[in-house]
Swiss-Prot record:
Region spans: Disordered: 1-23
PANTHER family in UniProt: JACALIN-RELATED LECTIN 11-RELATED, JACALIN-RELATED LECTIN 3
InterPro entries reported in the protein's UniProt record: Jacalin-like_lectin_dom (IPR001229), Jacalin-like_lectin_dom_plant (IPR033734), Jacalin-like_lectin_dom_sf (IPR036404)
Classification of source organism: Eukaryota, Viridiplantae, Streptophyta, Embryophyta, Tracheophyta
Single GO MF descriptor: carbohydrate binding
Keywords, alphabetical: Lectin, Repeat
Every Jacalin-type lectin domain range: 2-148, 151-293, 295-445, 452-595
Coiled coil location: none
Name of the protein in question: Jacalin-related lectin 17
Family to which the UniProt record says this protein belongs: Belongs to the jacalin lectin family.
Length: 598
């Protein structure tokens, strides 16, 4: 059943025309707004009902003001979640509106002048499906109808077997995760949730037997939430999940269990996990999840002087240009990415030759701006007497790759940092006139890292399988060989700038161990060349020779001088892990790769 949100703005409807689109629609498809200096002159909502567009009559004058539209792609599961508006009681008019969906935020349509009262139409966990309000010369009030958002359900992944369990999706988030491992794999999993601000204690799924229990806590009070799960399950008779790892918008848990078996993941870009389901009996057999929209975060610093501007949100940022003089930042110019197309926005003034122009290029989609350092200074002589003397003095940007821009402007002692953990900037807002008087940013969770690929191993069928898994990069390689070929391999990996020592595979020989060390972090491995053949004393082929190629050089040859008959690589990818088969000799070798983003 839909919930009615009372109209905001002028609530005295005497002498005004009331309108009500009702609550019998499924979604909003398009919003059309006309505005002029005095306020919103016309507004129209095109709805979706049973998959078909529905056009309603519209309040206001369709011939006055500048027309702006905001399309909502309901076919891509986009829906309207909230409206922010600015009502001026002096002119009895709504002056500006801004619309937020589960995927993006519109520009501010209209104005947000000093003296205007801000209002919001939204209920957490619900979407807007209808509007009502009143108008005269201008739009005087606006209300809405909302209903629950149906969460996205990802089917359970893992092995077959077990009894079905379902924690449901009526939660706001996850607070604690308990995992117990045993001989066959994970014995049980238990989730604690948050609902209406209260802790909900979940039930264990599986059997509490002997083993180790690990706990991963999520600090929802610090706006931390779960965004993905990765795990491994046995494809054999047991069908049991062997290991599991959880990722929030801020950090990643340790791997709980082992990385043996087939890998799976539960993730939905731009969404957070609010519930789990799956199958379990004596052990945990499979796991699925419910997802809902991840929240945008808006942060801003500065004064309330000058007119507000708000670019809304885009997919990412390609370039930022800052214009400044010796006193303050005069203009902010941004190139946004909107589904592969560049959209430019600029706010402020550019008066050459008195103003300098700085540029910061972002390697989108591989890089996001993650923080903005803003310094504020006071002007002794404001160029606009009616405005405050506090202005933005300088701006400095940092990115997800750890890069820091130049400082644009003259830094002041009053400093603020716009930053949201685990998020990137997807839009800017602020207040500008002659100078920039305030600056803010819209943040959304950084997209998940690209999925790794497992390149098939080359060689013979002998030996037992091994798999080191996937890391960030390779730091060092150890190779031992005998008269027949390669007998021993070991790898040092890097994960989150920490060294991870891989397992020994094979046995060292009297010929010793050779090493190949990469110049981390600038050098990375891009291919492995080798050969395999049948040799005396071995029923299946063994790896005879290996040679490694990086983005900077090629290693020496390890093993015996033979003609290579295989290469392990993928174009535009780097090697981040190894797998294979080992017995008395190395029979197979394969690699894990990730797209190169540096």
């Amino acid at each position: 059943m839909a919930q009615r949100l009372e109209a905001e703005g002028n609530k005295n409807f005497k002498g005004k025309s009331k309108w009500d689109d009702g609550s019998d629609k499924d979604d909003i498809g398009k919003i059309s707004v006309r505005c002029e200096d005095g306020g919103i002159t016309y507004i129209r909502f095109d709805y979706i009902k049973s998959g078909q567009p529905q056009y309603n009559t519209f309040p206001g004058n369709p011939g006055r003001g500048i027309l702006q539209t905001f399309d909502i792609n309901h076919k891509n599961d986009e829906h309207l979640e909230s409206v922010e508006g600015y009502y001026d009681p002096k002119s009895d008019a709504i002056k500006g509106l801004q619309f937020k969906t589960n995927m993006r935020i519109s520009e501010l349509i209209g104005y947000a002048n000093d003296g205007a009262t801000k209002f919001s139409l939204a209920v957490e966990g619900k979407k807007i499906i209808g509007f009502h309000g009143a108008y005269n010369t201008y739009l005087n009030s606006l209300g809405a109808y909302v209903t629950w958002i149906v969460p996205t359900k990802l089917k359970a992944k893992g092995g077959k077997g077990g009894k079905e369990w379902n924690d449901g999706a009526d939660h706001e988030g996850i607070t604690k995760i308990y995992v117990r491992g045993g001989y066959e794999g994970l014995q049980y999993v238990k989730f604690d949730y948050i609902k209406d601000g209260q802790q909900i204690y979940g039930s264990p799924h599986g059997v509490r037997g002997r083993g180790f229990t690990e706990l991963f806590e999520i600090n929802h009070l610090d706006k931390e939430y779960l965004i993905s799960v990765e795990g491994y399950y046995d494809e054999g008779e047991s069908g049991v999940i062997q290991g599991i790892q959880f990722k929030t918008n801020i950090r990643t848990s340790e791997l709980m269990g082992d990385n043996r078996g087939r890998k799976f993941s539960l993730a939905a870009n731009g969404k957070k996990i609010i519930g789990f389901h799956g199958y379990a009996e004596k052990n945990l057999n499979s796991l699925g999840a419910y997802f809902t929209t991840s929240p945008f975060t808006k942060l801003e610093v500065g004064t309330t002087s000058a007119d507000l501007w708000d670019d809304g949100t885009f997919d990412g940022i390609r370039n930022v240009y800052i214009h400044y003089d010796g006193d303050a930042v005069c203009c902010v110019e941004v190139d946004y990415d909107n589904k592969g197309k560049v959209e430019k926005r600029e706010h402020g003034i550019m008066i050459a030759p008195f103003i300098e122009r700085g540029e910061f290029v972002v390697d989108y989609p591989n890089e996001f701006i993650t923080s903005v350092e803003v310094t504020i200074s006071k002007q002794n002589d404001s160029p606009v007497p009616s405005l405050t003397s506090e202005t933005v003095a300088s701006l400095t940007f940092k990115t997800s790759k750890g890069r820091t821009s130049s400082t644009f402007g003259s830094p002041a002692t009053k400093k603020f940092v716009l930053q949201s953990k685990g998020c990137g900037v997807v839009g800017f807002l602020g207040r500008s006139s002659y100078y920039t008087y305030a600056l803010g940013a819209h943040f959304c969770p950084l997209p998940p890292l690209p999925d790794g690929e497992k390149v098939e191993a080359k060689g013979g069928d002998g030996g037992a399988s091994w798999d080191d898994g996937r890391f960030d990069c390779i730091r060092k390689i150890y190779i031992g060989h005998s008269e027949m070929g390669i007998a021993f391999v070991k790898f040092l990996y890097d994960k989150d700038n920490k060294v991870v020592v891989g397992d020994d595979h094979g046995s060292k020989t009297l010929l010793g161990v050779d090493e190949f060390e990469l110049e981390h972090p600038d050098e990375y491995l891009i291919s492995v060349e080798g050969s395999y053949d049948v040799v005396d004393g071995s029923e299946s082929e063994v790896i005879r020779m290996l040679r490694f190629k990086t983005n900077m050089r090629t290693s020496q040859l390890f093993g015996h001088e033979t003609t290579s008959n295989f290469t392990l690589q993928k174009e535009c990818h780097k090697i981040v892990g190894f797998h294979g088969k080992i017995g008395e000799m190395l029979h197979q070798i394969g690699v894990h790769v990730l797209p190169i983003t540096d």
